Amino acid sequence: MLKLTKALFCAAAVSMAGLAQAADPIVIKFAHVVADNTPKGQGALMFQKMVAADPQLKDKVKVEVFPNSSLFGDGKEMEALLLGDVQMLAPSLAKFEHYTKQIQIFDLPFLFDDLASVDRFQQGPQGKALLTSMEDKGIRGLAYWHNGLKQLSANKKVILPKDARGLKFRVQASSVLEEQFKAVRANPRKMSFAEVYQGLQTGTVNGTENTWSNYESQKVNEVQPFFTETNHGLIDYMVITNARFWNGLPEDVRGKLQQIIDEVTVEVNKQAEALNQTARQKIIDAKTSQIDPLTAEQREEWRKAMRPVWDKFSDQIGADLIKAAEASNKAS
């Protein structure tokens, strides 16, 4: 009798533990490397808030946001995602060349005229196909988030391609971006985002490329006296998740999370340009740096100098994909 009672007690304990475990919310750790007041930072917080407020998800899913490389840095976050240590990231599109060469298209200099052109390509069939192109590597793309168009900064005035010659520019870990600077006889240096300020301050690098919001949020204007408004390239992000984690979610939860991501994406992309313009004005108001816009003729010189990079990566990316991206500039 005692043995039976003990067995029943153990069974009940296991059952109660199972119920408690079933009631535990699904935790989504969303890590990123930038500040909260950037387009990506705002998007992550918006996603967290909307999940917490959703009647269907609020007791089932908990989102935790880790900004400013506070959980994993630039070089470690992708590995952490694949190991399941984080569930969501939004890396720069420059970070995916090891998983699919086609995504290098977003790093090609002077490919897109403006963010409207980027939108047309990303929301078209070719852009959407890229989101699911890495599932066999364990990565599922959920959306594209804008940051914005890139500008140059340096410790000297850089107006024409010849002015960049010999300067050391920080780049993300991207073969295309390395070749972009080599095309103007500058020296690219790979460096994580968190190291950029110190690298510029100490002279490890002389300049960099980024968006206004990233420049201002990291106070790069304190260590860079000159900015050149080139709009030469794109910094966008892909919101990604671990494919096994995503496919293992209950179907109703997965569908609702995707719906919220889609809603957040609309807002992030709507706000990105406004955030960049506000950041640009803050840099002007700080009176620490000079911003030089380019004339059409000067910009064309940069375009011609960097255009050979397209040919170098055409086979890897796909000539048809590049043509589709170019066509987005002409769409009405």
For each predicted feature, which ranges?
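Repetitive helical segments and hydrophobic/amphipathic motifs
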Residues: 12-15
